[in-house]
Amino acid sequence: MADRNLRDLLAPWVQNVPARALREMVLDSRVAASGDLFVAVVGHQADGRRYIPQAIAQGVAAIIAEAKDDATDGEIREMHGVPVIYLSQLNERLSALAGRFYHEPSDQLRLVGVTGTNGKTTTTQLMAQWAQLLGETGAVMGTVGNGLLGKVNPTENTTGSAVDVQHVLSGLAGQGATFAAMEVSSHGLVQHRVSALKFAASVFTNLSRDHLDYHGDMENYEAAKWLLYSTHHCGQAIINADDEVGRRWLAKLPDAVAVSMEDHINPNCHGRWLKATDVDYHDSGATIRFASSWGEGEIESRLMGAFNVSNLLLALATLLALDYPLSELVNTGARLQPVCGRMEVFTAPGKPTVVVDYAHTPDALEKALQAARLHCTGKLWCVFGCGGDRDKGKRPLMGAIAEQFADIPVVTDDNPRTEEPRAIINDILAGMMDAGHARVVEGRAEAVTNAIMQAKENDVVLLAGKGHEDYQIVGAHRLDYSDRVTAARLLGALA
């Protein structure tokens, strides 16, 4: 677009830059087109500067490249008539550059960030739904996808590149979004993908084992999450006081809102707070009574399990802290919809209840099983596996949890990737006291089918790990498969 100009874009950092109109900002030279700005970053796997000739051949208007080797910060060169501006620490600056390029979209809507191991998707979706019920135009960004509510487009990563994030936010603002709830991953924080965003509020859900193949240990993982509050424009902090890490952080964040289901709040010690005073679980969800700095209330929820009550309370506390009226939030709470693939319930007359959930960490699996147990009067089945080419340490932990909390654990495949499926299953079984108690069924579709066909009417069958995903990765192939579709089809056929 003509209103994007290279000189204006770089004004805070570099002087004497030529005035060039810019169309789009791209990190991938393969999609660069005439009039684009190509940004050549040095990544973990590739050096974008190697692709500068390709970008020039494709007609880009200008290039910004990492200042390394013989180039200095702020240096301007020209290659085949194309200006190349070198900036040091380009990855760290990318969010700010993209923010300027897309006219600071986080200033144009109310943006809430949600970080934590589990609960990010449900909390963001509930928050956006709730804000929309109160008159906002809600949008979400995260694992399930990006977009206005009801018009979400699938994504590859929880948090896209720094350019993607600003581009998507700009698009949402352009579509009329006034409120956006965004999942913020630990990878995204460490890699500076959201460093220039202006969050109105930042929510911490919990911290448990995940991504240790990337972070190395829990200390580094916690430090990555803490970056949202220590180095970002986090706005109002909303912290889960039931989490041990959350309680540590509350001690460092005196203005944070503390949220609890387990009475981990002393109103004399914290600033503002919200806590559940009573939760009644029933067949169709839960009745939640709460007290808070803003007053008391009762909400009927269609969500399953204690952790979803926690997610709902975090969403409620965030909206209260952003000055949405308590009475309107209470009056609309019953209209909140369960989230796709997150403790999503499938039923048919006379058949077992099937619950599809994304739980793929030890903590999430334990919580999903505990949640399902609250609504189960018969046997609790758990069909699950672990991803290949990922953190192997969690496999025996998940095996132990399934054995402890399910009546009938069924171990199967879940994106084995390049690993041998049976080897992954054996790693899971190694965590069980009595591996012979578990049913082993290689091939996820067969495992799910067998469980649903064999379960009785008052049983609950938890299908854990895939949630909203509609694929299975075997070797290098991405095959069509969905727990949700399989469950719906089987119950429909059985009914």
UniProtKB/Swiss-Prot annotation:
Its cofactor is Mg(2+). GO terms for molecular function: ATP binding; magnesium ion binding; UDP-N-acetylmuramoylalanyl-D-glutamate-2,6-diaminopimelate ligase activity. GO terms for cellular component: cytoplasm. UDP-N-acetyl-alpha-D-muramoyl-L-alanyl-D-glutamate binds at residues 27, 29, 44-46, 157-159, 185, 191, 193. It catalyses: UDP-N-acetyl-alpha-D-muramoyl-L-alanyl-D-glutamate + meso-2,6-diaminopimelate + ATP = UDP-N-acetyl-alpha-D-muramoyl-L-alanyl-gamma-D-glutamyl-meso-2,6-diaminopimelate + ADP + phosphate + H(+). The modification N6-carboxylysine is found at residue 225. It is found in: Cytoplasm. Gene3D superfamilies: Mur ligase, C-terminal domain, Mur-like, catalytic domain, MurE/MurF, N-terminal domain. SUPFAM superfamilies: MurD-like peptide ligases, catalytic domain, MurD-like peptide ligases, peptide-binding domain, MurE/MurF N-terminal domain. Its main location: cytoplasm. Carboxylation is probably crucial for Mg(2+) binding and, consequently, for the gamma-phosphate positioning of ATP. Belongs to the MurCDEF family. MurE subfamily. This is UDP-N-acetylmuramoyl-L-alanyl-D-glutamate--2,6-diaminopimelate ligase.
